[in-house]
Curated annotation (Swiss-Prot):
Part of the ABC transporter complex PstSACB involved in phosphate import. Responsible for energy coupling to the transport system. Residues 16-257 form the ABC transporter domain. It is found in: Cell inner membrane. This is Phosphate import ATP-binding protein PstB. It comes from Cupriavidus pinatubonensis (strain JMP 134 / LMG 1197) (Cupriavidus necator (strain JMP 134)). It comes from the Bacteria. Its EC number is 7.3.2.1. ATP binds at residues 48-55.
Length: 262
C-alpha cells in the first residue's frame, strides 16, 4: 500500500476528519485506508484518473451508499465530533447538513419555486412570505435569481443545462447545509456555464465547506484551495492546491498533473 503525503498546515481547522476509511463494493476493495482532514470553509478538489475512487470517497460523506446493502464503509468519518459511519442520526438530517450536486443536472419535475421549497418544507415550517424570501435567497446565492424571477412557477426543465445545474445548487443550499459536495458538476456544461459555476463555487466557500470531484485539472487549479490526488483507491497526495500543481511531493502526482500519467 502506498504511503500518503499530506501537506496541510496544523492551523487549518478541519470540518470532516477521515480516519482509516475503507470502502467495498461487495468483495471489491474500492477505498484503501484513507486518512485526511477536509478543511472548513475551503474548496477541496479530488482529482485522479477514472475509477480511482474520487466519487466513491465523496459519496461516503453523506452515506449515499446506504441504499445498496452490498456496499459498506469501515473506519471513521468524523464531523462535529460524531462518526457518521456509526451514527444513528437520521439519514435525511445528515443529507440536509451535507448537500450534494451530481454530474448531470437533476431538477425535480416541478416548478422552479417548488424545486427550491421542496427540501425546505421537509425540515422547516415557514410562512409563505418566509418561503418566498428563502427561494429568492437561494436563487440569488446560485446567481440564478435575475434569470428565473419572472418564471418561478414554470417547470425547471425549461431552463438551460447550466441554469438547471445552478438550480440544483440553489436547491442544495436552500436548506442551509454545512457541507456541499459537487460530483463533476460542470462535465455536461458548455464553457460559459462552467465559468459561472466556478464563480459560484468561489463565492460559496465563504459560508460552506465545498468538496468537488473533477477530471479537469485547470478547474481544480482555478477553484480549489486544497487538492487530493487519488489512484487505485488510495490517497497519494493531499495539500494546498498551489503546491500540488507547482511542486508536488510525489512523482505519481506530478506525472498525472503534467499529462505523463499512464
Amino acid at each position: 500500500m502506498t504511503s500518503t503525503v499530506i501537506d496541510i498546515p496544523d492551523s487549518v481547522r478541519a470540518k470532516i476528519d477521515v480516519r482509516n476509511l475503507n470502502f467495498y463494493y461487495g468483495q471489491f476493495h474500492a477505498l484503501k485506508n484513507i486518512n485526511m482532514s477536509i478543511p472548513d470553509r475551503k474548496v477541496t478538489a479530488f482529482i485522479g484518473p477514472s475509477g480511482c475512487g474520487k466519487s466513491t470517497l465523496l459519496r461516503t460523506f453523506n452515506k449515499m451508499y446506504g441504499l445498496y446493502p452490498e456496499q459498506r464503509a469501515e473506519g471513521e468519518i468524523n464531523m462535529d465530533g460524531e462518526n457518521l459511519l456509526t451514527s444513528r442520526q437520521d439519514i435525511a438530517l445528515l443529507r440536509a447538513k451535507v448537500g450534494m450536486v451530481f454530474q448531470k443536472p437533476t431538477p425535480f419535475p416541478m416548478s422552479i419555486y417548488d424545486n427550491i421549497a421542496f427540501g425546505v418544507r421537509l425540515f422547516e415550517k415557514l410562512s409563505r412570505s418566509e418561503m418566498d424570501d428563502r427561494v429568492e435567497w437561494a436563487l440569488s446565492k446560485a446567481a440564478l435569481w435575475n434569470e428565473a424571477k419572472d418564471k418561478l412557477h414554470q417547470s425547471g426543465y425549461g431552463l438551460s443545462g447550466g441554469q438547471q445545474q445552478r438550480l440544483c445548487i440553489a436547491r442544495g443550499i436552500a436548506i442551509r447545509p454545512e457541507v456541499l459536495l459537487l460530483d463533476e458538476p460542470c462535465s455536461a456544461l458548455d464553457p460559459i456555464s462552467t465559468g459561472r459555476i466556478e464563480e459560484l463555487i468561489a463565492e460559496l466557500k465563504d459560508e460552506y465547506t465545498v468538496v468537488i470531484v473533477t477530471h479537469n485539472m485547470q478547474q481544480a487549479a482555478r477553484c480549489s484551495d486544497y487538492t487530493a490526488y487519488m489512484y487505485l483507491g488510495e490517497l497519494i497526495e493531499f495539500g494546498e492546491t498551489e503546491k500540488i500543481f507547482i511542486k508536488p511531493h510525489r512523482k505519481e502526482t506530478e506525472d498525472y498533473i503534467t499529462g505523463r500519467f499512464g
